[in-house]
Amino acid sequence: MINLRNDYCYIAHPKVLENMQKYTSDINVGYGLDKHSVRAKELIRKELGTRENDIHFLVGGTITNKVFISHVLKPYEAVISCDTGHINVHETGAITNKILTVPNVNGKITSQGIKEVLSQHTDEHMVKPKMVYISNSTEYGSIYTLKELQEISKVCKENNLIFFIDGARLGTALTSSYNDVEMKDLPTLCDAFYIGGTKNGAILGEALVINNLELSKDFRYSIKHYGGMYSKGFVAGIQFETLFENNLFYEIARKENELGQYLESELKRINIEIYMKTETNQIFILIDETKVDDIQKEISCEVFGKVENKAIIRFVTHYLLEKEDIDSAICLIESVNK
């Protein structure tokens, strides 16, 4: 079976596992106050080029979104998201604040879409828009340009909105060949974002970076309140320490993107219809519904939706994948599609 299902289907990158094993017998302080977590935060701050932030490690994307959004918003305040935003479609109602959606453009929200929502919510008989949520990369593997992020940031600042970036796949966004955003840009662009480890070589864990320190007061209370605090916080600390020690975080993501580009080019070569342009490690194709079962017999992948009589299949490249695996997948798809 060729695995193109997702980028979190293995326990962890070998180097992460090696370091976890290395520190097996160490005695650590709990709750994220250990030496590994402290050092991991310093390594992240070095990447950001600033110490003016508050960093917390949480177990996964949904709990990170849940804790942060619940901490900073009042019950009557709402989040603006595109219709395909993860908090809107894949978090089982975890976000209890109302989500105001706008149609996505290639998986992304636009500054104009935000303005339209603001124009429709004008008084206390409606929820009050207070946050803009995006993910980078998006649910469709697309990425935001620096100009797009600057435009969103400008609208947020002009309208007193909190700008929050879901970075579950931030690694692939920052290492995309189409990208012009650096990690050091994020502190000036948004109020908070997180660095995804779960989908970038870690066993689990996300690093939430709160740039707007006015939002971080008593944040550890909220982490505990919502069940997001690790007793063994050093488990995340060791992993992020490893990911940011020698650029492993970027190395993993860059490989995934390169394989994604290769897979897309090979799919085009055999005349498979691409649903959306590939910018990172998620590739979406359109194929006759009757051929899905034959593909899934040999390739682990997900059906993402339908367009008329065609299925949208998502392929995701990962750090343990090799070009030879892609070549085998292409041969199979080509034979099925004849």
Where are these regions (language model features)?
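Conserved N-terminal alpha-helix of the aminotransferase class I/II PLP-enzyme fold
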Residues: 13-60, 83-84, 88
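Active-site phosphate-binding strand-loop segment of PLP-dependent enzymes
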Residues: 4, 110-167
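Active-site pre-lysine segment of PLP-dependent enzymes
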Residues: 145-154, 158, 169-192
